[in-house]
Amino acid sequence: GPMGVGKSTVTHLLCSECAQSVMLDGDWCWFQGDKEWDFSDKTKQMALNNIAYLLNSFLQNKAFDTVFFCWVLHEASLEASLLNRLTKPFDFYHFSLICTPDVLKKRIFNRAGLTENQKEAQWKRAQERLSGCRELKTMLLDTSDLTAVDVCQMIKERIHAD
């Protein structure tokens, strides 16, 4: 899902509630502070390399049964590029968290620690990412009227149903 939809919050909850699990937030792999981020192809490739390295490490570690990963994956090519870099077989569930544009705007503009210019820039990018997420072949979860706890429960039910 797009930035501001609740991916990190939900993933933290999932990791806390599921035994022998670990989480990776893709933003950790190219965090650029509070300044305007560089979204060039060079930095995207660096982020994908870093993410793949960490995911492969987690998947190979027998201490973890479940790896929760969150990142803005709004293009099928990003997902394919990342999956092609993973070396160990695993069960894969891809959820896209979405919400209405009004709810997304409210969430972004209520975020602490961002300047108004940063919020405007995030809102612009988030709108583009939201439409891309809706087009992917994933399990879409509309979080507009849900709490993070509700979304966490829905994901756990879908994962454990298999």
Give the residues covered by each predicted segment.
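Short glycine-/polar-rich loops that comprise or flank the Walker A/P-loop
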Residues: 64, 88-93, 134-138
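Glycine-rich phosphate-binding loop used to anchor ATP phosphates in small-molecule kinases
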Residues: 46-89
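Conserved nucleotide-binding/hydrolysis micro-motifs of P-loop NTPases
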Residues: 29-30, 74-75, 98-103, 146-147
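Conserved phosphate-donor/acceptor-positioning beta-strand/loop module used by diverse small-molecule
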Residues: 71, 88-108
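P-loop (Walker A) phosphate-binding loop of NTP-binding proteins
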Residues: 2
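Conserved substrate/cofactor phosphate-moiety recognition/catalytic segment
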Residues: 8-53
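Small-molecule kinase domains that catalyze NTP-dependent phosphoryl transfer to phosphate-bearing small molecules
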Residues: 113-154, 162
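ATP-binding Walker
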Residues: 5
